[in-house]
Regions:
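Short, flexible loop/turn elements at secondary-structure junctions
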Residues: 21-25, 40-42
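Mixed-charge (Asp/Glu-Lys/Arg
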Residues: 13-23, 34
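Extended acidic low-complexity intrinsically disordered regions
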Residues: 1-16, 27
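Short, surface-exposed, charged amphipathic helix/loop patches that serve as local interaction elements
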Residues: 30-147
Length: 147
């Protein structure tokens, strides 16, 4: 089989990984910690998200563009979370702060950061980075860098 055949007929399309974020989020059906299911992302998805996270900064030398890493990670998590659906209206809607006011609707990446505690968010982010080989200790990337 040639490399082209392998590319056109991959063994799998996407990998998934389930991760429990802690004991605070309990599945009402099982009574066990709820799990989030993450999937791998494509290079195109990553590039599209990265492009949306470019911000312009100013320094003494003028203006320059850089990636807002916090926004990039949150958007990647939303895009790659298969279950629960982090783009759902229910997830993105918060109760009004004042009686009689309308519910507050925010973007999925903002809702994710508001709903999860720091350790939960960190577990989800770590699982995402491991699944997509974006962790800092990736041996494949280390080998490429060394050569």
């Amino acid at each position: 089989m040639s490399a082209l055949d392998a590319l056109l007929n991959p063994v799998y399309e996407t990998k998934t990984k389930e991760v429990a974020l802690g004991n605070r989020l309990i599945d009402p059906d099982t009574g066990k910690p709820a799990t989030f299911t993450l999937r791998t992302m494509t290079t195109d998805e990553r590039a599209s998200i990265r492009k949306r996270c470019i911000v312009t900064r100013e320094s003494g030398d003028g203006k320059y563009n850089e990636v807002d890493n916090e926004s990039f990670l949150a958007r990647c998590l939303v895009e790659c979370c298969v279950n629960p659906d982090l783009k759902s209206t229910a997830f993105c809607t918060f109760p009004p702060r004042e009686p009689g006011a309308k519910p507050i609707v925010v973007s999925p990446d903002v809702a994710l950061k508001r709903r999860l505690l720091v350790p939960e968010y960190e577990r989800l982010a770590s699982a995402f980075m491991e699944l997509n080989a974006m962790d800092e200790s990736n041996p494949a990337e280390d080998a490429v860098t060394k050569n």
